[in-house]
Amino acid sequence: MMSDSTRTQAISAIASLPVSGVSESAPVRIDYYGADVFSTEVMKKYLPKDTAKTLLSTIQDGLPLNADIAADVAHAMKQWALERGATHYTHWFQPMTGSTAEKHDSFLDPKGMEPIMSFSGKNLIVSEPDASSFPSGGLRCTFEARGYTAWDPTSPAFIKRHGNGATLCIPTAYCSYTGDALDKKTPLLRSRQALGNAVKRLMKCFGLPDERVTITLGPEQEYFLIDKNFYLNRPDLVQTGRTLFGAPPAKHQQLEDHYFGSIKPRILNFMNDVEKELWRLGIPAKTRHNEVAPAQFELAPLFEDVNLAIDHNMLVMEILRQQASRHGLVCLLHEKPFVGVNGSGKHNNWSISYGDKNLLDPGTDPQQNAIFLTVLAAIIEAVDKHSDLLRNSVASAGNDHRLGANEAPPAIISIFLGDQLNDCLLYTSDAADDRISVDLG
């Protein structure tokens, strides 16, 4: 617990912060959006035409990766990264720790005293980091140390900047020698492929031509911000990311006046800097606002392919922490850092698209929308049969602590359709008395 003197010192430090006035804004520049991403446009600029076409067919159409183009892609990626100031590269992956991992290697490959910057196709496609110290969920013993990172071309490489340099980050999957998933990305890629195959099979039953299946996601990110002076005086926050004891404030969220309230200048400055960093990485941060609890806020992006959206969310959390530190703040991403007020969820706005058709869009007359009703029924059955797997996928000490305590979602898996869709399903399922005709197009 903070003593009166340390609390007074912390408040004095906050009170002495310079107040920034309102200045004339310069014209808006957005030409830096995605500047640090090895995007489709960059590929077309740096790669031979045939190589770019082959790589894009893997990214956009899901065709198997042609290993013969790896050397050309690696060379182009290296040239682009060097021009952007990167001296190192890393296979960026997501072990079962809830965060990301990376091991940096320099491009430097000297021949005698002659410095040469090199990056081979093998360096791009695969790496062998030691996996013995990463959690495996009981899949293997510690002495089974070998692990492999494999390039995921469907998520573009990007440049991560720091104080005096930059690193080329290559998104990768992480697995064992026997193919067991040691990360979060591998199961996601496998499930995306399985769902895509099932959707194509279903659409074939409706007589639709073969189209690309896209699983879209827009993960909202909630977070708390507190001044670093208060944070450093709370060992529980420093060690666990949440408070373990303390007295509730006289006023917290009873008046519901913080939600969507006017954003304080210090916080708004922080948000602006966060968005600039996100936009450089091609992350479509769209919405920012005060959340329900005091000192709680939210950042929401536009929808993207689910694999890319999750990679972007990992970067969002990292950038929130980094920018908070630069503003004399600490960003708390624990799901329940304070008792008695809302915790921080990560609401996932999820959908399935077939070509340009959103399969979860009911349209103006859902009762006549056979495709929508079929997909909806399949999702309801899947949740009913596999709620244990869904619940397990979001189970963690922090999230289990949050669910059911001053939160909107309960601790169980459930579906709420609303009265209109609920009545629609009840009506169409009443086959004994009434039958309706459905236009299959």
Language model feature labels by segment:
Residues 31-145:
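Active-site core of metal-dependent hydrolases
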Residues 66-68, 206-217, 285-289, 330-334, ...:
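Flexible, glycine/charged-enriched surface loops at secondary-structure junctions
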Residues 147-275:
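ATP/Mg2+-dependent ligation/transfer catalytic cores
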Residues 221, 291-299, 344-346:
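Short, conserved phosphate-binding/catalytic loop or strand-edge motifs used
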Residues 255-258, 297-306, 350:
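Short, hydrophobic beta-strand segments
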Residues 262, 312-315, 319-333, 340-341, ...:
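Catalytic or ion-translocation cores adjacent to nucleophile or general acid/base/metal-coordination motifs
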Residues 374, 378-425:
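Polar, glycine-rich mid-to-C-terminal structural blocks
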Residues 427-436:
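Conserved small/polar residues in nucleotide/adenosyl-binding loops
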